[in-house]
Amino acid sequence: MRVLQGFLRIFFRHFYTSLAWSYDLVASIVSVGQWDDWVLSILDPAPAQPILEIAHGTGNLLHELARRQANSFGVDASRQMCRMASRKLKRNGHASTVVQAKAQALPFQQESFAALLSTFPTEFILDPASMAEAHRTLQAQGQYRIVPMAEIRGPGYFDRVAGWLFRVTGQYAELPATWSQPISEAGFVVRMEDVNLSRSRVTRLIATRSSRKEGQVA
């Protein structure tokens, strides 16, 4: 299992860079067509504005936010992902609002955003430097919404196969109670919740910026 997880770590590193062109297709296939629904679940209810998406990928969520005329911006560490997201926005008649940057060093002033969003982030999400930057750039009582994973639960054959693959490759697992501790310690009040869709269950974390440095789990 460790060998498999090591291989997947290398694969995902290329998936976000040299293989970024294949991201949307692969995501749709492995999720059995549910990927967009999982990503968009982070917008219910509509977040306050202005909004920053951290690790925006190919820009699907930014495109939806722009379609809703939301005041939104995006950052991603991958040059390839930034290029793809910018092209997608412009192709659909929207201004490009993406910046290449790491979550650990956001190029924005203090309390710039009312909401931060991240869907299916990699390990950076629990880096104390990332959470410190999230706390710095969020307004008082602002929300950092995170969708860390989804579970495929449909009864169909392909859903069952995909669900099994998600489990054996570690793409889905029950989050331990301590998973959100680094987020709480960064100064957020954390609430975990499930979003039930027709063929899957999405795990969603709502982290509200606390005025003090030690948060708590709600």
Put a short name on every predicted segment:
Residues 1-46, 60, 159-166:
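Conserved class I S-adenosyl-L-methionine
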Residues 104-115:
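A short acidic, Gly/Pro-enriched loop at the edge of an enzyme's catalytic core
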Residues 142-148:
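Conserved beta-strand signature within the Rossmann-like core of class I S-adenosyl-L-methionine
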Residues 129-140:
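A short glycine-rich, Lys/Arg-flanked "PGG" loop and its adjoining helix->strand segment in the class I
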Residues 115-128:
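A short SAM/SAH-binding and catalytic strip from SAM-dependent methyltransferases
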Residues 52-105:
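Class I SAM-dependent methyltransferase SAM/SAH-binding core
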